[in-house]
Amino acid sequence: MKYPFQCFLAKIILLALASSFVSCYDPSPLQDYCVAVPEKNGVFVNGEFCKDPKLVTSDDFFASGLNIPGNTNKRLGSFVNPANIPGLNTLGVGIARIDFAPGGLIPPHIHPRASEIILVIKGKLLVGFVSSNDYNYTLFSKILYPGDVFVHPIGLVQFHANIGKTNAVAIGAVGSQNPGYISVGDAVFGSKPPIDPKILAKAFALDINIVRYLRKVFSPQDDIVND
């Protein structure tokens, strides 16, 4: 045992490095649960005030209504109905029902804080995501039928589209109580204030008049940047 201290120190350093590689997108809870309440008379955790644990009931961990179809009479022909469960606060998960009219879709978008898993309940969906430039922007896509499941990694562009002739229903579960949602089209062509059309025209190899048109589609209330 010539260098016992050095060996011990090396183990500590390796343990610290290994711990630094572990990622946690939602903070680990410091208690069994923190049921969110609107009143400001409790303990403040993860952006919400916690209900007194002595007053927590089973209903705080319950939600109904995911059996009710959403209104898909919209431009994109889809509707997302997230389950509103106060007890989800600090638990790092979320769930929603997604309804699609024939031809309806959830456009290319990003969840910056969570991976997502899709379970098809009814209909026929085309789903997919695109890898980063590290993997040459590869498209991973599948056609899903009832009972099929597909996973979307965190932070990558993804989409869901109903390619069937009937309505479709899916359940989406995410690994965060607040996964975030960034629509690619809205972010690029509907930002506030708007991105200069010259920049977008050059970036996407588009005629500047097409950029102006897309700006009106994604943000009809805003004026175009003077060029």
Curated annotation (Swiss-Prot):
Lineage top rank: taxon: Eukaryota
Positions with a binding annotation for Mn(2+): H109, H111, E116, H160
Disulfide linkage: C34-C50
Location of the Cupin type-1 domain: 64-212
CDD domains, per database record: cupin_OxOx (cd02241)
Any Pfam family hit: Cupin_1
Swiss-Prot/TrEMBL keywords: Apoplast, Disulfide bond, Glycoprotein, Manganese, Metal-binding, Secreted, Signal
GO cellular-component term (any): apoplast
Residues bearing attached sugar chains per UniProt: N136
Gene Ontology MF term list: manganese ion binding
Residues in the signal sequence: 1-24
Alphabetized InterPro entries for the sequence: Cupin_1, Germin, Germin_Mn-BS, RmlC-like_jellyroll, RmlC_Cupin_sf
Subcellular locations according to the entry: Secreted, Extracellular space, Apoplast
Subunit organization: Oligomer (believed to be a pentamer but probably hexamer).
Family: Belongs to the germin family.
Function: May play a role in plant defense. Probably has no oxalate oxidase activity even if the active site is conserved.
Protein's UniProt name: Germin-like protein subfamily 1 member 3
Source organism per UniProt: Arabidopsis thaliana
Lineage: Eukaryota, Viridiplantae, Streptophyta, Embryophyta, Tracheophyta
